[in-house]
């Protein structure tokens, strides 16, 4: 019937467990809208969760939405249209690295350079921010989802065990690492249950963080190279500020064990992980929403 029955965490619980009458949809892929109608319905669902007032007056809302800094005009237009269809009255867009910087507590209007690396699910956003604007940026479609896909592929190839996307994500959370030597911070092995790819018999496979670090190596290297390429395009004065202030990591990908150390060793600049990396973009967008007049230049 194309009627929405769940959104957000509740829908995620159903993912890969549905029958023919229920579809689970990810409206966003690679940081951009993949399914316009589903995206609009998702926004309506999320608004309903927040706005639990009387149904008589449908709220006309002011919204701030984070978008990848590498978005094309068409992609930005799609986000704006989706929000307006879902009853957004004043729709403002903010680039995700800018929102992350505000959420981390950086003074984005200061005349000094700060670099943010925001590793989300679909895209990694790297931006140098100064005087309330983005001076140089690099947006790549390599991020958390790719790490999950790497693990799925590795388990199938190396251990002959079929794992779902959700199980691969659990492996990433429990034993994911960017380094093969974590010393005292090494997590315990994680036992993966799944069917054998060939015989379909049940299997139990213990997985250690070292093998996952090997399997994620290529994708992490792509993120490393993207950071280096953004630094190459940074004006020397701002570069000096970045060396002094360090580089901030935000987004779910920042939680990958040893990522900050690996990047630091490779690039020779200190890396800091945001206090609550998963929510720094949302926090920043919330602060921007309360200060629309002050941050008017951030919105597009």
Residue spans for each PLM region:
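Nucleotide/phosphate-binding catalytic cleft detector across ATP-hydrolyzing
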Residues: 1-119, 127-247, 254-300
